[in-house]
Amino acid sequence: MAVYAIGDLHLSFQTDKPMDIFGPGWIGYEETLYENWQNTVKPQDSVIIPGDFSWAMYLDEAVEDFRYLNGLNGRKILLKGNHDYWWETKTKMNRFLKENGFNNIDFLHNNSFEIEGVNFCGTKGYDSKEADEKIINREITRFSISYESIRNKSARTIAVFHYPPEKELLYMMAEYNIESCVFGHLHGLEKS
């Protein structure tokens, strides 16, 4: 079994927000993603999705995005991103999954997951240029709650964020002996 991570899918099967307005690299990306995913990810694998999964504004507008995701191989674990406006309480989201028969999707929110002896904990994080103290403290608290939910703290732990981790979260990772993390938000890197 393998664990993969990919963020910022920005699916919009029910909303009129095509990604190709951001450049030709996005044209037909859903088909390319599907083909590459199915050729790489096996049914027994897991995929961490650190945010920005869907452009939907409300959960009921994300049904087709979830249907697409559910049809992909592997177990998917979603973390909230800055554009996941559809995100509700975990109870409502789990009910939504059950009502729609989406049986291979979970949410990383104030909890953690153990996959093949490796722990995954995390939170959305924040952009230090935009976040105020309240948001920073909220994300620190959520990361702490997520980490504290881990049963076997002696096992390897990987942190999951949407935003690249800022100094407070990096300090916490060091305190918790977390040596690696995955994150989304950055769609590409350009050399300056």
Which residues make up each language-model segment?
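Active-site glycine-centered loops adjacent to acidic/histidine catalytic or metal-binding residues
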Residues: D8, G51-D52, G81-N82, H162, ...
